[in-house]
């Protein structure tokens, strides 16, 4: 994460009203300082805006366990999937801004949907505000064994000599697995045909079955089948600037010649707009403590993630930068929602 850029400067650059960039409004009228200090005073609801089984589930449970241990309040993880995270994110946006309903956020609902959809039930920065990044994970360029390539160089040569004949899969139009592939193809000067699926599990089944040629898969969900099926798929590269300790023998696209290529899946904590600033601060501080020691960092690493806490302002900067990147790709490729 780059050094902190003051939020006021970011707002000025983006020509946005200050209230849109605020990380949490002042406590609402009638809410006493004592109430804020007593937070949390009832069980927490941590919403995952995807169906059960996504990479976000262990993040939600790990953070919830820490909050319960620290604050003595129980929590429930509620999966509200659908529309690439829109439904669950919209639910949190409309929830009471008291810090008791929280969102585990990720690129789809936060940096992609606002650039792809025209009628979102929320505005990022106004209805949904960042609290802290929690973890990041690179994506893995996974090729089917049907592709005659044992490494990235051979893979790139295959695509170059067979323009428009290779097929890449995604978990859906506009999904981060789609946009990462488009960014790769643009930067590498290659071409391939997009084959969108309705969810990652279908992609993985067809990738293992040899029905598609390659897929950019977040490491947490890719690492198991890569290791279990070396005869069916090959991990050719990772999308982070540095190699992953989970796949130490797999090079980065950056070191393979795509200088500066850096695309990561990430997992963060967000809250409803209007959440009192003292509550945002308390949540951020406890998230930072959770990621600095204890059980949570080890649990996240066990899923292929790298723990990374930020201030709300740093997380906001990260969101803005990534949103601009995806906006450019969506416009250039004329990507439309299904």
Which residue ranges define each predicted feature?
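N-terminal signal peptide c-region/cleavage motif recognized by signal peptidases
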Residues: 17-19
